[in-house]
UniProtKB/Swiss-Prot annotation:
Protein name according to UniProt: ATP synthase subunit beta
Keyword Transport applies: yes
Subunit organization: F-type ATPases have 2 components, CF(1) - the catalytic core - and CF(0) - the membrane proton channel. CF(1) has five subunits: alpha(3), beta(3), gamma(1), delta(1), epsilon(1). CF(0) has three main subunits: a(1), b(2) and c(9-12). The alpha and beta chains form an alternating ring which encloses part of the gamma chain. CF(1) is attached to CF(0) by a central stalk formed by the gamma and epsilon chains, while a peripheral stalk is formed by the delta and b chains.
Cellular component, GO, one term: plasma membrane
Positions annotated to bind ATP: 152-159
UniProt record similarity statement: Belongs to the ATPase alpha/beta chains family.
Source organism, top-level taxon: Bacteria
One Pfam family recorded for the sequence: ATP-synt_ab
Gene symbol of the encoding locus: atpD
Lipid bilayer topology: Peripheral membrane protein
Length: 463
């Protein structure tokens, strides 16, 4: 273990000088020693500048750092605890417990920088994962071992949707989950912990947080820390769920670090290594012949612009994309999933079956036609439409409302009990609407219900 000294501090970036024959490698973890608030602060090597000097990023607050402090090279990258000891615990980017429940007591640690599984180790799966959320199961079904992105601007419900998915899948799937909170609000991390505790699945979830108020180094690496824990469970032959909230903050932390390291920015001010950084993370989130990682990632869309380089780069890596729309949210329809923008590779007759495919296609066709007719209705009114178009509009409005659903995790602030709808009931309900079986029912009856049977019951009560 070689020792060096701090020679320059620029915010979260720290330059350290080592003897010429003992220069640390890129990604090695260094530790500040000596007195003061910074004792034990971990630095990660990012660049070798020559002359024995390395440029590092601080994995904590650099307040109180000064030139001349002694730094020790650990000789390996940052490592985190893995295995069952992490379940039910909240950790930071370094794998240190932050829940005041004592030491983790792990038997094994993994380094966070690891190679992605090779081609021959990867497995291809087409098994569907039922979520119990109608709009998702119908239009953009998830694959077990697949990657899903929840895209949306500020305040359209990404975190609530993710919490509902965790609630539904973690309970039904009864597998293990890892939750990586990347640059999100501490309040949400706190809410998530108590949500898991109240629903009795805390002992199946490992939580790693690098929140909004932490330095960019933490936010950049916390996703890798969470992923490393998930990889351990996968390599033991288990099926793991990896939840990342929010992938955009991971990109943003990379942008901050890149600027601090003096790299020239690329489009919209993002780091020039955006695609590579995203690829390094996403390529590791994959299923092998041993076990699977099913990942759900929230992706913040800046200014609701899906062409922004960050969400656009993320799109390429996903099997299913769930796009949340502000326009749909403004109508009071939750979950505010846009059935025309959301896509899934699984929506194929060979995977989901012909009936499911036809119903999903029919729903999208009717909604698309309604979208086209809206301008005519706004200018000329409903009376100018043909009988066929009128029927399409009435059915589309019922479909729109039937796509809404009360959530378990939202019970506290909506007052209505959550509903889990099986895929079979979802297909039956939408097929009935498309075939005109429920044309006689008022459209209000379709709003915020579970299965089609509840619609009939609600309509009968209103008579």
């Amino acid at each position: 273990m070689s020792t060096g000294t701090v020679v320059q501090v620029i915010g979260a970036v720290v330059d350290v000088e080592f003897p010429q024959d003992a220069v640390p490698q890129v990604y090695d973890a260094l530790k500040i020693t000596g007195e003061g608030a910074c004792n034990g602060l971990v630095l990660e090597v990012q660049q070798q500048l020559g002359g024995g000097v390395v440029r590092t990023i601080a994995m904590g607050s650099s307040d109180g750092l000064r030139r001349g402090l002694e730094v020790v090279n650990s000789g390996s990258p940052i490592s985190v605890p893995v295995g069952t000891a992490t379940l039910g615990r909240i950790m930071n980017v370094l794998g240190e417990p932050i829940d005041e429940a004592g030491p983790i007591g792990e038997e094994e640690r993994y380094v966070i920088h690891r190679a992605a599984p090779s081609y021959e180790d990867q497995s291809n799966t087409t098994e569907l994962l039922e979520t119990g959320i109608k709009v998702i199961d119908l239009v953009c079904p998830f694959a077990k071992g697949g990657k899903v992105g929840l895209f949306g601007g500020a305040g359209v419900g990404k975190t609530v949707n993710m919490m509902e998915l965790i609630n539904n899948i973690a309970k039904a799937h009864s597998g293990l989950s890892v939750f990586a909170g990347v640059g999100e609000r501490t309040r949400e991390g706190n809410d998530f912990y108590y949500e898991m505790k109240d629903s009795g699945v805390l002992d199946k979830v490992a939580m790693v947080y690098g929140q909004m108020n932490e330095p960019p180094g933490n936010r950049l690496r916390v996703a890798l820390s969470g992923l490393t824990m998930a990889e351990k469970f996968r390599d033991e032959g288990r099926d793991v769920l990896l939840f990342v909230d929010n992938i955009y903050r991971y990109t943003l932390a990379g942008t901050e670090v890149s600027a601090l390291l003096g790299r020239m920015p690329s489009a919209v001010g993002y780091q020039p290594t955006l695609a590579e950084e995203m690829g390094v993370l996403q390529e590791r989130i994959t299923s092998t012949k041993t076990g699977s990682i099913t990942s759900v990632q929230a992706v913040y869309v800046p200014a609701d612009d899906l062409t922004d380089p960050s969400p656009a780069t993320t799109f390429a890596h996903l099997d299913a994309t769930v796009v949340l729309s502000r326009q749909i949210a403004s109508l009071g329809i939750y979950p505010a999933v846009d059935p025309l923008d959301s896509t899934s590779r699984q929506l194929d007759p060979l995977v989901v079956g012909q009936e499911h495919y036809d119903v999903a296609n029919g729903v999208q066709t009717v909604l698309q036609r309604y979208k086209e007719l809206k301008d005519i209705i706004a200018i000329l009114g409903m009376d100018e439409l043909s009988d066929d178009d009128k029927t399409t509009v009435f059915r589309a409005r019922k479909i729109e409302r039937f796509l809404s659903q009360p959530f378990f995790v939202a019970e506290v602030f909506t007052g209505s009990p959550g509903k889990y709808v099986s895929l079979k009931d979802t297909i039956r309900g939408f097929k009935g609407i498309l075939n005109g079986e429920f044309d006689h029912l008022p459209e209000q009856a379709f709003y915020m219900v579970g299965s089609i049977d509840e619609v009939i019951e609600k309509a009968n009560k209103k008579k």
